[in-house]
Amino acid sequence: MGTSARWALWLLLALCWAPRDSGATASGKKAKCDSSQFQCTNGRCITLLWKCDGDEDCADGSDEKNCVKKTCAESDFVCKNGQCVPNRWQCDGDPDCEDGSDESPEQCHMRTCRINEISCGARSTQCIPVSWRCDGENDCDNGEDEENCGNITCSADEFTCSSGRCVSRNFVCNGQDDCDDGSDELDCAPPTCGAHEFQCSTSSCIPLSWVCDDDADCSDQSDESLEQCGRQPVIHTKCPTSEIQCGSGECIHKKWRCDGDPDCKDGSDEVNCPSRTCRPDQFECEDGSCIHGSRQCNGIRDCVDGSDEVNCKNVNQCLGPGKFKCRSGECIDMSKVCDQEQDCRDWSDEPLKECHINECLVNNGGCSHICKDLVIGYECDCAAGFELIDRKTCGDIDECQNPGICSQICINLKGGYKCECSRGYQMDLATGVCKAVGKEPSLIFTNRRDIRKIGLERKEYIQLVEQLRNTVALDADIAAQKLFWADLSQKAIFSASIDDKVGRHFKMIDNVYNPAAIAVDWVYKTIYWTDAASKTISVATLDGAKRKFLFNSDLREPASIAVDPLSGFVYWSDWGEPAKIEKAGMNGFDRRPLVTEDIQWPNGITLDLVKSRLYWLDSKLHMLSSVDLNGQDRRIVLKSLEFLAHPLALTIFEDRVYWIDGENEAVYGANKFTGSELATLVNNLNDAQDIIVYHELVQPSGKNWCEDDMENGGCEYLCLPAPQINDHSPKYTCSCPNGYNLEENGRECQSTSTPVTYSETKDINTTDILRTSGLVPGGINVTTAVSEVSVPPKGTSAAWAILPLLLLVMAAVGGYLMWRNWQHKNMKSMNFDNPVYLKTTEEDLSIDIGRHSASVGHTYPAISVVSTDDDLA
């Protein structure tokens, strides 16, 4: 082809690719804005919402002309430029006025710190809570709050480690490094046990009565060894047909056998396994596990070790300002565009009428904010805090949609955002974290034979309750300063005062077969617990006087439990088949699943009431995740085989999440939004099972509606909070013990023909106890003094005398039911188990708020309870 013909073809192609429409024409015409936009005098288009909002968004200020002048409210601070910001934003270390006048030194140096606050120095405008002084963290921007603090002095019953840390004297010479520097185990004499004690191989001492009782109390199990007892320990646990029993006694799902991931405590599920190979459609991770091949190089870490995302090639190589993608698909360097050389097959890199033309000179290219001229064409861009909504117009970015952008409260502003803290918290300007005001928060956790506490600031590490048997679950009533825990060996729930130096504790609830977790309702003063043996969830008053099953069906392996009495909901995890997390009203109504997918072994759950989220640990997936309280907006916080080897329980406070790992025998902490800032708080634990944060802000105060108008809400037995679904939801309902139903008045209880008792099949004799209410709720052993009552059987003559009267009553009731059915045969209705929910003609869900009595809260029908004694026998 000749040179002239080649150039003719080049011109023809260039004309074909030339743009046929442009927002800004060469003649200088202004582009017309859409109906949802405002056109500035200079021709630019901005969103209509920005008209007369106090900010000049048009470069010529025309969007703020002819606007009604706004006046600031009394609760606002007036900036020098006339802008209004809330008074609480003044002198908070964050400029909110566009001119920065809310943070001017003249204004802020005049500021006086409030009661319980201290100044960060004469040259600082910052005030911090008194409790933050000498807490080990720099809260003042100049660090003055951590100066001249002196050495920490340990109390008389504490030991001072070489590092200056305080630990309980009981931890000295116990064979464990509790100081983390080994100083508590220096110069220790050989340990000796008392005459009535047995010395474990680890040198610790246990009562002689605990030896050879088929319950390993020594951490090395030497009290149940073959050499000591002459036999192997008898394992009483019977696993369901869908599970297998580990050598260490616990049950796991059959499908977890030989899957490459040890799930038994002793690893026996991975012994004598054939060599594992992945299927052809699977990818083998470096740790040997298999994932579906489609998950490799998908941008998500599906392998725990992340090996599925290693050496992945970027499919789209045409990213960045230095690249140009041809319309025919090739990717070339931007330097080759408009160089009069064909680099794209279709010549799209050499458009004749677009090369080196600055479209931004006319009407800013139609861009509302920034116009960037390119070698070919142009592109619109936005200032920080804004994003393109239609390729030309900029709109505000809602930064509050990003998890963790604020510690607690996020307020979206035009072009930015503002972080605030909930009541009881204050912003730490050094970190941006909302820190609790008041006493030092601490972690309290079980350690099998004792309960321990570690401060989260000064790291003081002490023993709260000692000489326990097998503590597996823990919670607290913080306002009452009481601890509650469940002991697996003693099959009971106990309580103790957290400040009781004598170490006394009391049995509150007996006959708890296999407690998995407990949760204290600090508002209505009840306690909820899951029982892995009876497959039930129960509730009782804190003194144990009244109790009942809340759920005793559709539970396979109930595990962790958490309550939110402010909204009336209870949450629990179940690792049976299928594994799930559920929620329901704390009165037993409105039960529904929360998490049902991508979940296998949900061991621990906890609630973040400040951010309205639920966090859980999956011991099989080695993952920490969260959802909102409706089961939406699921996020993976951390996935780690190292730090989540076998996590058991977790708790949350401020911006940190803390958990116990059974395999590593340690307590860890991490950022609750990102999983970063991993830290080890405690090591060398002995079968730790549960953990809580102890601080008054963990349990926010709420109104006990059961004590609003009359005692116990007028209920004969239990008064339980109802789920607050909407503004018309009842505040509470009455509930009866097992074997009883509510009468029509919604307050009193009547007996059914099949009463339920809490008798145990082994080593426990139960007694029916007559309560002052006249109810017999089953064999409940409590610490309060009660009288044993025997009820003689009624004579047969009395039964024959009542029989004719009973037949007449049944005939009358039958006739009434037939008449009512005839009367309502044409009425269109929908019947539910809970009759307060009715179907309306508008297809909306409405709630009937009728009361049975003026003295009682709204009522639900009675819950039918079925005995589980046969299942437990």
Curated annotation (Swiss-Prot):
Got any disulfides in this one, which pairs?
A: C33-C45, C40-C58, C52-C67, C72-C84, C79-C97, C91-C108, C113-C127, C120-C140, C134-C149, C154-C166, C161-C179, C173-C188, C193-C205, C200-C218, C212-C229, C239-C251, C246-C264, C258-C273, C278-C290, C285-C303, C297-C312, C318-C331, C326-C344, C338-C355, C360-C371, C367-C380, C382-C394, C400-C410, C406-C419, C421-C434, C706-C719, C715-C734, C736-C749
Share the record's PTM remark.
Answer: Ubiquitinated at Lys-839 by MYLIP leading to degradation.
Is this entry keyworded DNA damage? no
Coiled-coil positions are none
Biological processes per GO annotation: cholesterol metabolic process; dendrite morphogenesis; glycoprotein transport; lipid transport; positive regulation of dendrite development; receptor-mediated endocytosis; reelin-mediated signaling pathway; regulation of synapse assembly
Cellular compartments per GO CC: clathrin-coated pit; extracellular space; glutamatergic synapse; membrane; receptor complex; synapse; very-low-density lipoprotein particle
Q: Where is this cross-link: Glycyl lysine isopeptide (Lys-Gly) (interchain with G-Cter in ubiquitin)?
A: K839
Annotated motif Endocytosis signal, positions: 832-837
Q: Where does the record say this protein resides? A: Membrane; Membrane, Clathrin-coated pit
One GO MF annotation is: calcium ion binding
Give the record's subunit note. Answer: Homooligomer. Binds to the extracellular matrix protein Reelin/RELN. Interacts with LRP8. Interacts with LDLRAP1. Interacts with SNX17. Interacts with DAB1. Interacts with PCSK9. Interacts with PAFAH1B3 and PAFAH1B2, the catalytic complex of (PAF-AH (I)) heterotetrameric enzyme; these interactions may modulate the Reelin pathway. Interacts with STX5; this interaction mediates VLDLR translocation from the endoplasmic reticulum to the plasma membrane. Interacts with CLU.
Q: Reproduce the miscellaneous comment text.
A: LRP8 and VLVLR together are required for correct embryonic development in the brain. Targeted disruption of both genes results in a phenotype virtually indistinguishable from that seen in 'reeler' and 'scrambler' mice. Subtle effects of VLDLR deletion are found mainly in the cerebellum, whereas lack of LRP8 predominantly affects the positioning of the neurons in the neocortex.
Q: What is this protein called?
A: Very low-density lipoprotein receptor
Organism, as annotated? Mus musculus (Mouse)
